[in-house]
């Protein structure tokens, strides 16, 4: 008996059981049978509809049918009645699109279609986006089934991408190719300037060779001579026209050239003096007395027209410098009464050894034999600040250390211990600095506004950075035409917007703005590293000796003579925004290690360093960890949890990140070391208020390395200095710094690209 017939018999039996009555005999049989068959067919239609929507009931009926076959039930005796078999793979048995197979045990569903997971009967959508099939920064949209990726991000191109299933998503990634905007013309660099393609974007650089100007004023072919304001330039073809604060124009010879700007000659060693004399009268027009060795002070003790920096017998006494115990003072007899490193002719303590020749008050008498080291007319034995002039000898905390030199003037600490070299004694050093400018909150005149310079023009205890009336003249800074100089009347005879009281000298420090390195800070007027702090970064190590620093050219040149442990020479002036430049030169063919400079120095655990290694080398002391130095220029942020010592020493040597010590912010991808006896000019821009850092290096007139924009806010300002590590005979010449809080144009472009 077929399953359909069995169902028919069951339906007829059900009809009779519900009181439909017996089938009558006789002449009325045919109509009655017809009606019952019609009713039966209607009932079967209901059953079929029920089978479509209820899978469980279908399964039950299938099992019932199979049981009917097993019981051997006979066809109904009703004449003329036929039945059809019920299909095992009824509609809805399997998920749409899944193959259904009839078996002896019932219907069997095949696998779920691509993009779904389940048993074939029930399938759910797979989220292919979890496999990250799209290009970074591109949104993935999951669909049912499959996925698709949105368009490639700005700066990239590529086809649309979509697919179905995890396997496809894992093995087929969206491909977006960098657009070279410099080749396609999709950039906004001014004509005749350098366009540098970057991943997903581009950067605009200086003018191309043969052109002068910048991205703001445009690049004109040399010979056209235009100034930034568009006026014809009076400068030499190798000079740049600079627009000063007062609107006047100045001419400055380009890197690799020297002179007065109206005339420029080749400057091989980049010390600011031309190789040959120029036909102009200014000092910088004179012939360089050491053409290949930078000596920005042009010192020449024996006046033989050969500078001391390159004269094998600088003092002309017949004794070579290497053997001369007074290389800069003529002393052919080489007499040395106290047997130190210095002959009597140049020894500031002839009868007492003092190799350091330190002379705090610069009176010609070394500290080692001077009974009044600071020159305040109080003998050392009675002076509570023997190295700092303090006539009043005040000592607020009574610890025997005068307030003028006490690193905790309100707290008893006679030992003056200061492990992090920040001039705040450990006894009162909280290390709480919420604005990150290097001044702890209790000593910061603007605790919540970064102002590393701590400038306070009206000396009211409130820093200019958070004072709305810097000069305390009753006129708010926002409308004061002399913000730093009291002028309540606001006189301005020429009506140029700058008050008469500060015309030409904005900070009234008696140094005109044109030559003032910080025209808005009366405390800083000229570049000067004559007073500096020595910081030894591995004080306990015995691998090498400490650095030996020599300052020349009235504080604008520093020489380090020894193969030494890592160390710093740090100036005392702190800066907010700053431009820092100088000439770097290793004047020897001996060794191949690190030299560089620092900025943002806040303490011996917190500073930025730009350092250059000549050759790859593993540090010779593997304790506390192996450190490998790679050749090339590196920019690092130092935030050491231990401070000076072997941990920081090895972290500085290592090219890369070291946890809790050093982060590598940028490395010159050329991996090129410095060359022996070759001069390089660096230019640093630091704007701590936004974290902007950019450093460039020139070899002669050619740009050889450019970090482009680096953003980091670990140090919100600080002091400047120079750095050495295991390298002798380093010269930092023609040093210049300048206060500058103006945000460079490329900062905004970089910020938008990152966003």
Curated annotation (Swiss-Prot):
Domain EGF-like, residue spans: 85-124, 125-177, 178-220, 223-265
One family name in Pfam for this protein: TSP_3
Region feature Mediates cell survival and induction of the IAP family of survival proteins, mapped onto this chain: 525-755
GO molecular function: BMP binding; calcium ion binding; collagen binding; extracellular matrix structural constituent; fibronectin binding; heparan sulfate proteoglycan binding; heparin binding; integrin binding
Entry comment on modification after translation: Proteolytically cleaved by metalloproteases ADAMTS4 and ADAMTS1 with ADAMTS4 showing more potent activity.
Primary site of residence: secreted
Details of cofactor binding: Binds 11-14 calcium ions per subunit.
UniProt cofactor(s): Ca(2+)
Domain of life: Eukaryota
Cysteines engaged in disulfide bonds, as pairs: 89-100, 94-109, 112-123, 129-140, 134-149, 152-176, 182-195, 189-204, 207-219, 227-241, 235-251, 253-264, 280-285, 290-310, 326-346, 349-369, 385-405, 408-428, 446-466, 482-502, 518-739
Residue ranges occupied by any TSP C-terminal domain in the UniProt entry: 530-744
Region (COMP N-terminal): 21-84
Signal peptide per UniProt: 1-19
Coiled coil segments of this chain: none
Keywords on record: Apoptosis, Calcium, Cell adhesion, Disulfide bond, EGF-like domain, Extracellular matrix, Glycoprotein, Heparin-binding, Phosphoprotein, Repeat, Secreted, Signal
Matches recorded under SMART domains: EGF, EGF_CA
Residues linked to a glycan: 119, 740
Gene Ontology annotations for the cellular component aspect, listed alphabetically: collagen-containing extracellular matrix; extracellular matrix; extracellular region; extracellular space; protein-containing complex
Phosphoserine modified-residue sites: 394
GO biological process, one term: bone morphogenesis
Biased composition (Basic and acidic residues): 332-344, 350-365, 412-424, 456-465
Residue segments, region Disordered: 295-501
Quaternary structure and partners: Pentamer; disulfide-linked. Exists in a more compact conformation in the presence of calcium and shows a more extended conformation in the absence of calcium. Interacts with ITGB3, ITGA5 and FN1. Binding to FN1 requires the presence of divalent cations (Ca(2+), Mg(2+) or Mn(2+)). The greatest amount of binding is seen in the presence of Mn(2+). Interacts with MATN1, MATN3, MATN4 and ACAN. Binds heparin, heparan sulfate and chondroitin sulfate. EDTA dimishes significantly its binding to ACAN and abolishes its binding to MATN3, MATN4 and chondroitin sulfate.
Annotated family: Belongs to the thrombospondin family.
Annotated function: Plays a role in the structural integrity of cartilage via its interaction with other extracellular matrix proteins such as the collagens and fibronectin. Can mediate the interaction of chondrocytes with the cartilage extracellular matrix through interaction with cell surface integrin receptors. Could play a role in the pathogenesis of osteoarthritis. Potent suppressor of apoptosis in both primary chondrocytes and transformed cells. Suppresses apoptosis by blocking the activation of caspase-3 and by inducing the IAP family of survival proteins (BIRC3, BIRC2, BIRC5 and XIAP).
Protein name per Swiss-Prot or TrEMBL: Cartilage oligomeric matrix protein
Taxonomic lineage of the native organism: Eukaryota, Metazoa, Chordata, Craniata, Vertebrata
GN (gene name): Comp
